[in-house]
Design a protein with these regions (language model features):
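Face-selective signature of the C-terminal outer-membrane beta-barrel domain
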Residues: 1-134, 148, 210
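Residue-level signature of outer-membrane beta-barrel architecture
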Residues: 6-7, 56-60, 114, 128, ...
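Outer membrane beta-barrel strand-and-loop segments of large Gram-negative receptors
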Residues: 51-55, 97-109, 184, 188, ...
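Surface-exposed extracellular loop regions of Gram-negative outer-membrane beta-barrel proteins
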Residues: 25-27, 83-85, 132, 152-195, ...
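Extended non-membrane alpha-helical scaffolds
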Residues: 196, 201-205
Length: 263
């Protein structure tokens, strides 16, 4: 849940602030029984997290062709997690990931929209993130150019750099060789260059078609040394190995959108 406050400094300047919170509680227990129905625990997981999220943005219309938006998002994450896993059947549980505390993810951005003329418009800006858990940070430029050829058709080209942090359990993985030390605590953000083309066509007053081919180049992806494991193809709900930001990846495809407004 959350609450939102809006304050108009004047007809061209708006400050919008939102405070929200989320809570998650996950428990998982897996037990194997032998022929005599003697139990042998395989997995014991307890994970609780609370996020408090404060977002604020200042929207300003400079003139009919230029607007600017500056924003800040502060996410305070409280976590308490403990994952124990038996390496083999009938062996005792070992701690895989354990953490109890809090950390912050701070995001800020500044973006502008400029109507160059009646047919060309440009959006550009800069986004930044800081994870206080390990003081990793990133700066991400983004821009898009749109050409409105006529009242029905438009083309656009967009580029953006994006990054993401991992799930909290990844940072607190512990191994037998490192004891109580969290081996992934200093992981950097996973990053990506995103390039997209767009074709939009207004079929009728209430119907429109949009075709958007895109390609994504990912880098600094957390992977396990001398292994094919990557967080990009993670199919388990836990990670139990030390990771390094040495992976790369690529995504590409085409999005089709058919939109019809209901009267």
């Amino acid at each position: 849940g959350g609450v939102t406050h809006r304050y108009f400094f004047n007809e061209n300047t708006l400050l919008k602030t939102t405070l929200a919170g989320t809570y998650s509680d996950q428990e998982a227990i897996q037990t194997t029984y032998d022929r005599e129905f003697n139990p042998s625990p395989n997995i014991d997981q307890n994970s609780r997290s609370t996020n408090l999220i404060l977002t604020s943005s200042l929207n300003r219309k400079v003139n009919n062709r230029f607007t600017n938006k500056t924003g800040l998002t502060f996410t305070q994450m409280f976590y308490n997690m403990n994952l124990e896993l038996a390496p083999f059947i009938d062996q005792p549980l070992e701690t895989i990931s354990k953490g109890d505390g809090n950390t912050s993810l701070i995001s800020a951005y500044n973006s502008s929209a400029w109507g160059i003329n009646d047919k060309l418009s440009l959006n550009f800006g800069l986004h930044g993130q800081l994870l206080t858990l390990n003081n990793r940070w990133t700066l991400e430029p983004r821009a898009s150019l749109k050409w409105q050829t006529n009242t029905r058709t438009s083309f656009a080209l967009a580029y953006g750099m994006y990054s993401r942090m991992e799930k909290m359990d990844v940072y607190f993985v512990k191994t037998q060789s490192t004891g109580d030390r969290s081996v992934n605590k200093n992981l950097d953000f996973t990053k990506a260059h995103h390039l997209m083309l767009s074709f939009a066509y207004k079929v009728s007053e209430n119907t429109s078609l949009k075709v958007e081919p895109y390609i994504q180049f990912l880098y600094d992806v957390p992977v396990m040394r001398d292994s094919s494991f990557s967080v990009l193809n993670r199919d388990e709900f836990f990670v139990e190995n030390a990771l390094v930001n040495k992976g790369r990846g690529r995504n590409f495809g085409v999005d089709f959108t058919w939109e019809r407004a209901l009267n």
